[in-house]
């Protein structure tokens, strides 16, 4: 795509500079690229080229600033304490006598399985919390599996009515204790519940509701919090080496990003609900992980291998002391068990975990750089955006213009070999695929040749998807949409016409999918009369034509940039972050003015990188977005906007953080990061090599992917 009508004004107003139409206005282009009033030629103030040093210097600063902003956010959003039961050890017999549970039926809905070894105080507190928050309308059995405790556990639990107390004659260890107790489970669902856990209101109802609200649920876990009120984990992620990360560790559990139900790599066995039949079929916890640790990770991976999903449901909250039940075994035993079982998990599941460990990086792709009849008609035969790119001039000292392409030159996208070279370059550095802008105006296509010739050929073999840039083409970009060249005409009939055209692409083997659902982006859903109805028509048409379900993501452009509207309001599955929209912090240019007619604005790239990278996540699926830079003065010489201090180092720091956040927040095919853009040359937003930076921005992409495997976060 390209920049929008109010780009310069929005940059000034700190709103959301976005894109402008690639069918550039010639009169503006010629006038605004005139060098008549520029005081100094470019050669008077040369800018340094990449030398392997200075272009990376912003990396450490930007990473540090991101960490500082996130820490400051945590400090200004204190957590709330939870009401935690804390029995006086001298009162344990009295507390045990007060426990009363209803007798379960012969075939209860849920069996709560509590493995214990000593720690009678914790066990009674756990049972008391269950009694306090057990739904009266659910048939529940409670099983306490005592692994030969040597304290007063047996004596204290003996008088408790309507619990099933199982006692091992000798200590079997956590894993075998759980597996042996499973033979006594009668419930349709089983909850593994550690005795150092206390449940809260609504916990069991919420966990059970997951199976009604989502498809193919195999296991679900709650939000774990510490007694201090801090988040312990909101699900967990796994790395191919077997190590895990507790999502949201020590964060505020009330943050929106931790408060929507989502799929995860695994959930902790400290509180895990699953269908009993499934658990018995797979044999419970694998004895490969004796005596304990990593058995819950393995269980969840096994459940997923059976074709089911593992969910985190934050509407169920439990308080977990963490490791109190294993503390008596000693730290040396614990660390040795962890080290051994991490190695076992790695050998068993590394290839499975590897499949989705790295987020897929998708670059927006502008299909503009070739002659089209509309450009010939309006601006002169043979006009392409290279005309604007090549004659841009610096407006102030330090302003990087013009941008001169290196490896690929001023290419023509009518040549399939150009697209092949682009694909080779992208894949060499770790880019997964391209998201082509798709232009449709009531049945008329524009700039369609690159993606059409891609569809008609098996080359290049690169994944791709489409983003419908569904807005009017206008002659002047003042935000008023006057002098419309080609108008949009959204209607029921057009909805069906456009999806029928798109289905051709969805059926291509290279088309990017999310869980086997073709991914379609919509640039401005708010321009439709009711995009939720449009999305419903699209989904129905795709089902009727054999495509199946599709995955629709809305771009957070214009008013959506900071609104945090849930995608479901528009009938969408997810949202796509689209920098620099919404978080710009304009500043005066830092260098001496060269163009006295310049009325545009600048901003510091490092600021936008920090703002987006440290931005709190919403309570829905939002794909992170990054950009290598931004400068639209090639189109608006006197009134454009630009970012200074755009360097590969700063970009890498931003991308690294986005990759890390994506890995924690999303699962599987939803681990996507979008880059704006591959080839937006007239906006200064491109990864393709230029003469100043060479391949360094592409190297930053590769570095960020590598660093995400090397930098371990607690």
What is each of the regions a protein language model found here?
Residues 205-207, 263-283, 288-317:
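A short, conserved alpha-helix in the catalytic core of glycosyltransferases
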Residues 1-108, 332, 337-357:
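Non-catalytic membrane-proximal stalk/linker segments that position and tether the catalytic domains
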Residues 168-185:
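Glycine-rich, basic loop-to-helix element that forms the pyrophosphate-binding segment
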Residues 146-155, 170:
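A conserved acidic beta->alpha catalytic loop
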Residues 175, 183, 231, 237-277, ...:
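A recurrent flexible, glycine/aromatic-enriched loop bordering the glycosyltransferase active site
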Residues 128-139:
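Short, acidic, metal-binding catalytic loop of nucleotide-sugar glycosyltransferases
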Residues 190:
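Short aromatic/hydrophobic "clamp" motif used to bind/position activated sugar donors
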Residues 197-238:
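Conserved donor NDP-sugar-binding/catalytic core segment of glycosyltransferases
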């Amino acid at each position: 795509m390209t920049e929008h009508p109010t780009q310069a004004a929005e940059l000034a107003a700190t709103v959301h500079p976005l894109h402008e139409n690639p069918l550039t206005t010639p009169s503006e282009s010629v006038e605004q690229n005139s060098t008549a009033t520029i005081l100094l030629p470019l050669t008077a103030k040369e800018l340094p080229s990449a030398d392997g040093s200075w272009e990376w210097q912003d990396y450490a600063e930007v990473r540090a600033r991101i960490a500082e902003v996130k820490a400051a956010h945590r400090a200004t959003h204190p957590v709330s304490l939870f009401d935690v039961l804390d029995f006086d050890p001298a009162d344990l017999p009295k507390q045990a006598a007060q426990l009363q549970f209803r007798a379960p039926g012969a075939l209860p809905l849920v069996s709560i399985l509590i493995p214990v070894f000593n720690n009678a105080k914790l066990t009674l507190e756990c049972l008391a919390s269950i009694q306090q928050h057990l739904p009266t309308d659910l048939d529940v059995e409670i099983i306490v599996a005592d692994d030969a405790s040597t304290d007063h556990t047996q004596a204290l639990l003996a008088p408790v009515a309507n619990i099933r107390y199982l006692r091992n004659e000798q200590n079997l260890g956590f894993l075998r204790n759980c597996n042996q107790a499973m033979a006594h489970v009668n419930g349709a669902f089983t909850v593994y519940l550690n005795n150092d856990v206390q449940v809260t209101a609504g916990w069991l109802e919420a966990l059970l509701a997951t199976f009604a609200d989502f498809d193919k649920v195999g296991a679900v876990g709650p939000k774990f919090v510490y007694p201090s009120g801090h988040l312990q984990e909101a699900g967990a992620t796994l790395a191919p080496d077997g190590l895990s990360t507790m999502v949201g560790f020590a964060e505020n559990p009330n943050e929106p990003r931790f408060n929507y139900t989502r799929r995860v790599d695994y959930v902790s066995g400290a509180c895990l609900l699953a269908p009993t039949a499934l658990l018995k079929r797979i044999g419970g916890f694998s004895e490969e992980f004796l005596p304990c640790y990593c058995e819950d990770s393995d269980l969840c991976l096994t459940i997923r291998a059976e074709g089911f999903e593992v969910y985190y449901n934050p509407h169920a909250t439990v308080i977990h002391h963490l490791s109190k039940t294993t503390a008596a075994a000693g730290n040396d035993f614990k660390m040795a068990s962890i080290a051994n079982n991490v190695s076992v998990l790695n050998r068993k599941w590394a290839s499975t975990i590897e499949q989705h460990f790295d987020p897929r990086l998708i670059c927006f792709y502008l299909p503009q750089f070739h002659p089209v009849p509309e450009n010939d008609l309006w601006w002169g035969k043979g006009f392409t955006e290279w005309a604007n790119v090549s004659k841009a001039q610096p407006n102030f000292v330090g302003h990087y213009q013009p941008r001169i392409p290196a490896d690929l030159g001023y290419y023509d996208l009518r040549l399939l070999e150009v697209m092949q070279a682009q694909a080779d370059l992208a894949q060499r550095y770790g880019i997964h695929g391209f998201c082509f802008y798709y232009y449709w105006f009531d049945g008329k296509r524009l700039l369609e040749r690159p993606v059409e010739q891609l569809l008609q050929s098996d080359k290049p073999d690169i994944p791709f998807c489409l983003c419908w840039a569904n807005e009017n083409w206008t002659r002047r970009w003042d935000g008023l949409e006057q002098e419309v060249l080609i108008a949009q005409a959204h209607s029921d009939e057009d909805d069906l016409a456009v999806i029928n055209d798109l289905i051709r692409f969805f059926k291509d083997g290279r088309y990017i999918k999310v869980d086997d659902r073709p991914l379609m982006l919509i640039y401005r859903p708010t321009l439709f009369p009711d995009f939720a109805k449009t999305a419903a028509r699209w989904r129905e048409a795709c089902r009727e034509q054999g495509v199946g379900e599709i995955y629709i993501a809305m771009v957070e452009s214009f008013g959506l940039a900071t609104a945090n509207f849930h995608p479901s309001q528009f009938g969408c599955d997810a949202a796509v972050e689209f920098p620099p929209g919404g978080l710009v912090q304009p500043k005066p240019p830092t260098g001496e003015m060269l163009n006295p007619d310049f009325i545009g604005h600048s901003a510091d790239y490092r600021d936008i990188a920090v703002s987006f990278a440290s931005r709190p996540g919403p309570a829905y699926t939002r794909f992170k977005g990054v950009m290598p830079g931004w400068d639209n003065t090639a189109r608006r010489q006197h009134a454009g906007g630009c970012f200074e201090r755009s360097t590969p180092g700063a970009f890498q720091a931003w991308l690294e953080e986005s990759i890390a956040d994506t890995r924690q927040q999303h699962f599987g095919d939803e681990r996507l990061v979008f880059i704006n853009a591959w080839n937006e040359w007239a906006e200064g937003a491109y990864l393709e090599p230029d003469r100043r930076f060479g391949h360094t921005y592409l190297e930053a992409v590769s570095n960020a992917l590598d660093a995400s495997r090397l930098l371990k976060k607690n």
